[in-house]
């Protein structure tokens, strides 16, 4: 296993996506416990992936991208992130949090 350390960074868009889903579950579906559990699961999944961010298959996209996207599945949702080489650091940049049935190619 590599000794590579990754710096974790989030895009504001990820926070917007996450907040939208959490608020919907808590307020519209009236299930704050499920919303809190989802939030905990998302946080745990990201931190578990951080030590080996590039050890998983990249997402194959029809679009040409500067950095390949990787996925983390959490319940009915998908977290999308990229790994950016910034000199001495490698950054795991978490970009989107989408419902797994959304049309991904239109939003990422």
Which stretches of residues belong to each language-model region?
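A short, surface-exposed loop/turn module that caps and links secondary-structure elements
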Residues: 44-73
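Enriched for short, Lys/Arg-rich terminal
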Residues: 72-78, 82-108
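A general structural signal marking secondary-structure boundaries and capping sites
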Residues: 25, 29, 53-54, 101
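Short coil/loop residues immediately preceding or within conserved phosphate-binding loops
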Residues: 5, 69, 89
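Arg/Lys-rich, positively charged N-terminal/basic patches that mediate binding to nucleic acids
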Residues: 1-41
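Conserved short aromatic-hydrophobic micro-motifs
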Residues: 42, 49-50, 81, 94
């Amino acid at each position: 296993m590599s000794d590579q350390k990754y710096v974790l960074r989030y895009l504001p868009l990820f926070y917007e996506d996450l907040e939208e889903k959490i608020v919907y579950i808590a307020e519209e579906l009236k299930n704050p416990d499920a919303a809190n559990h989802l939030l905990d699961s998302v946080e745990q999944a990201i931190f578990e992936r951080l030590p080996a961010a590039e050890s998983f298959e990249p997402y194959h996209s029809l679009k040409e991208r500067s950095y390949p996207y990787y996925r983390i599945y959490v319940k009915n949702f998908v977290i999308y992130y990229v790994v950016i080489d910034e000199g001495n650091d490698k950054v795991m940049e978490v970009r989107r949090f989408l419902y797994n049935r959304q049309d991904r190619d239109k939003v990422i």
